[in-house]
């Protein structure tokens, strides 16, 4: 399952479509306002009855500085006092949620994201973790996967020591690019030394895993400059790497309007960056997990992919997909059984709801039977690059070929083009098709607009 990916420029040009990242199916685009707090409470009670383990996501939206490329839900402020009122509401949300869960439900996974979680003071971080431990069953023996996103400019050795003391054992560091011209163009000045210091601290303090985030396609980047950044990152030997494609959508994300579109690399240059990056990482011993993610062979993600247990949810690739995911904080998304739900993305609305003693769920959806079938298919393909029809047929009581009869001509074209191997038993994505797994999964997405589906069929 972990063969080296093969670069096929012709296939990539033909199948390089815009499409979902499939951290869920159906995707968040399908969320509607018919889902509210009552649905969330009902799902939490069902989770309690089933005794499901938990994965928690905690959103801290504050950033001291704006990065022009960013599309996250965030509050830009240098006023550290703004976090206190937010934390009071976050604790209130934790209290409400915990009433509908059981102390028997172990929190196997915890992730603090943002924003910049280390925007919080040491005292606030201690208090937040104390409240989580008071109301929910966090593990005390370091066996859980407890991670936090870190801006190396907002952390030092003492920060890393505190976080380790509080129970965090995984860190994800934002790097994006080490080139100074690129950093100036996106308003994120960060020296390699700042990143190296945090990596060294994480190793010394025995964090289990270090992830670094890179972005290709940023203004002022060139294939050569990005290759130098990748070399510098490889020298740091992170356990995992995320290499994201920058999507320039200034009409949707206001900070991106500060980026000069003339400074963006061409599509051809972006493809060259991706090709060289995959080659550099492969030469350095990294495995391609899928969807922009790479890991060392002894990392848990690589091991899970090899033994067939890797999963994917709103936290990305995970070994805890069996957990019910509970999102806490403004804009946070939960996945509890067949319910997807999302908190208000407006911080004032979020806080007002909790002041009134109510959860701030504003949108979401319930998966139907067809969603569950397609979710299982997409999950298997995106995590393992192969699908046994018998597994889906046994789980859902269907005949795979009959159920997806209208897709068969497209699957046969994929096979003829070399993206997949298709036979009576299943689908195997080839080494040439793995970089295009998103395009393959799009075929099974019944919610894609018909225009996109037609475009998807015509590119062959």
Curated annotation (Swiss-Prot):
Cofactor(s), by name: [4Fe-4S] cluster
Co-factor: note: Binds 1 [4Fe-4S] cluster. The cluster is coordinated with 3 cysteines and an exchangeable S-adenosyl-L-methionine.
Keywords: 4Fe-4S, Cytoplasm, Iron, Iron-sulfur, Metal-binding, Oxidoreductase, Porphyrin biosynthesis, S-adenosyl-L-methionine
Residues engaged in binding [4Fe-4S] cluster: 63, 67, 70
Catalyzed reactions per annotation: coproporphyrinogen III + 2 S-adenosyl-L-methionine = protoporphyrinogen IX + 2 5'-deoxyadenosine + 2 L-methionine + 2 CO2
Catalytic EC class: oxidoreductase
Disruption phenotype: Cells lacking this gene accumulate coproporphyrinogen-III both under aerobic and anaerobic conditions, however they do not exhibit any obvious growth defects. The hemN hemF double mutant do not abolish aerobic and anaerobic respiratory growth.
Induction per the UniProt record: By the redox response regulator Anr under aerobic and anaerobic conditions and by Dnr only under anaerobic conditions.
Subcellular location(s) per record: Cytoplasm
SMART domains the UniProt entry points to: Elp3
UniProt-annotated binding residues for S-adenosyl-L-methionine 2: 69, 115-116, 176, 188, 213, 247
GO biological process, one term: porphyrin-containing compound biosynthetic process
Gene Ontology cellular-component annotations: cytoplasm
GO molecular function terms noted in the UniProt entry: 4 iron, 4 sulfur cluster binding; coproporphyrinogen dehydrogenase activity; coproporphyrinogen oxidase activity; metal ion binding
Xref: InterPro entries: Coprogen_oxidase_HemN, Coproporphyrinogen-III_oxidase, Elp3/MiaA/NifB-like_rSAM, HemN_C, rSAM, rSAM_horseshoe
EC number: 1.3.98.3
Residue ranges annotated for the Radical SAM core domain, each copy included: 48-287
Pathway in which the depicted protein is active: Porphyrin-containing compound metabolism; protoporphyrin-IX biosynthesis; protoporphyrinogen-IX from coproporphyrinogen-III (AdoMet route): step 1/1
Assembly behavior: Monomer.
Family: Belongs to the anaerobic coproporphyrinogen-III oxidase family.
Free-text function comment from the UniProt entry: Involved in the heme biosynthesis. Catalyzes the anaerobic oxidative decarboxylation of propionate groups of rings A and B of coproporphyrinogen III to yield the vinyl groups in protoporphyrinogen IX.
Listed name of the protein: Oxygen-independent coproporphyrinogen III oxidase
Organism: Pseudomonas aeruginosa (strain ATCC 15692 / DSM 22644 / CIP 104116 / JCM 14847 / LMG 12228 / 1C / PRS 101 / PAO1)
């Amino acid at each position: 399952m972990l063969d080296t990916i093969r670069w096929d420029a012709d296939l990539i040009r033909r199948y390089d479509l815009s499409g979902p990242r499939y951290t869920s199916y159906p995707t968040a685009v399908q969320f509607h306002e018919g889902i509210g707090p009552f649905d969330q409470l009902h799902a939490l009670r069902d989770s309690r009855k089933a005794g499901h383990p938990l994965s928690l996501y905690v959103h801290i939206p504050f950033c001291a500085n704006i990065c022009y490329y960013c599309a996250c839900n965030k509050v830009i402020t240098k006023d550290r006092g703004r976090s206190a009122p937010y934390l009071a509401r976050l604790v209130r949300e934790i209290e409400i949620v915990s009433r509908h869960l059981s102390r028997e439900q172990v929190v196997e996974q915890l992730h603090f994201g943002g924003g910049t979680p280390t925007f919080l003071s040491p005292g606030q971080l201690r208090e937040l973790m104390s409240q989580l431990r008071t109301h929910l069953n966090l593990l005390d023996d370091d066996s859980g996967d407890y991670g936090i996103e870190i801006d190396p400019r907002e952390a030092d050795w003492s920060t890393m020591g505190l976080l380790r003391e509080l129970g965090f054992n995984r860190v994800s560091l934002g790097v994006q690019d080490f080139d100074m011209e690129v950093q100036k163009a996106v308003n994120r000045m960060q020296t390699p030394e700042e990143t190296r210091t945090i990596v060294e601290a994480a190793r010394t303090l025995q964090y289990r895993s270090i992830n670094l985030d890179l972005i290709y396609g940023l203004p002022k980047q060139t294939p050569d400059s990005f290759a130098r950044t990748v070399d510098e990152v490889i020298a740091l030997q992170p356990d995992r790497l995320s290499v994201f494609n920058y999507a320039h959508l200034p009409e949707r994300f206001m900070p991106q309007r500060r980026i000069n579109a003339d400074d963006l690399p061409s599509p051809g240059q972006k493809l060259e960056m991706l090709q060289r990056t995959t080659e550099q990482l492969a030469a350095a011993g990294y495995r391609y997990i899928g969807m922009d993610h790479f890991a060392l062979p002894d990392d848990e993600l690589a091991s899970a992919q090899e033994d067939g247990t890797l999963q994917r949810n709103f936290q990305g690739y995970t070994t805890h997909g069996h957990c019910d995911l509970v999102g806490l904080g403004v804009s946070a998304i939960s996945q509890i059984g067949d319910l997807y739900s999302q908190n208000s993305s407006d911080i004032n609305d979020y806080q007002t709801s909790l002041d009134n003693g109510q959860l701030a769920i504003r949108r979401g959806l319930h998966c139907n039977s067809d969603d569950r079938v397609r979710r299982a298919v997409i999950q298997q393909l995106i995590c393992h690059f192969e699908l046994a029809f018998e597994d889906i047929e046994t789980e859902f009581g269907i005949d795979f070929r009959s159920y997806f009869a209208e897709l068969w001509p497209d699957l046969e074209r994929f096979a003829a083009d070399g993206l997949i191997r298709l036979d009576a038993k299943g689908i195997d994505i080839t080494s040439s098709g793995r970089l295009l797994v998103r395009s393959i999964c799009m075929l099974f997405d019944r919610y894609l607009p018909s225009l996109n589906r037609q475009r998807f069929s015509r590119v062959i």
